[in-house]
Amino acid sequence: PYVLCEYLEQRGDWGILEEPVPYLESPPLRPEERERYEQPERSRETGGVYDHACRAVEQVLRRGAGEHGLPRMGTGDWNDGMDRVGEQGRGESVWLAWFAAHVLSRFAPVCGRMGDAQREERCRDWAGRFAAAADRAWDGAWFLRGYYDDGRPLGSRGDEECQLDYIA
């Protein structure tokens, strides 16, 4: 959705939203797998570019927010070094909150233009929630990086790691 919103803004080519594109197929990770490098198969199922973007948005919203209102990061946000912060499903990411709020707020009008008022409202609602949760992550000197699965803050002013993170 991020790149799609950029494309729509720059090109104004709204017809792309209806272009059929195949989905990809890949088996879910097995319990002993943390990641997998592979070439996924193209599915016989296709969907418009808008449908693909909606599925990506729904994936984030299905994971939902953690205890602090931030998106759950699973086994990583943009920073691969954080891949164990949320591996039990409870870790949260401030960066992901900022990014999700930005993308959702930009994608909401796209939903509106597509006549998808319910998804438009849902995107606006979650964008506001994630932005507010990120604001609450201010630690007095910088923003926290996130929270571990056990609820401990990551990158607080009392930590030695993540003190000078570029995104802080």
Task: Tell where the protein language model's regions lie, with residue ranges.
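Aromatic-rich carbohydrate-recognition surfaces in CAZymes
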Residues: 1-68, 93-97, 101
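Catalytic cores of carbohydrate-active enzymes
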Residues: 99-168
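A structural signal for alpha-helical segments
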Residues: 41-44, 48, 88, 95, ...
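Glycine-centered secondary-structure boundary/capping sites
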Residues: 12, 67-72, 115, 151
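An acidic intrinsically disordered interaction segment
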Residues: 53-72, 132-147
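Carbohydrate-binding/catalytic loop surfaces
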Residues: 23-44, 70-91, 141-167
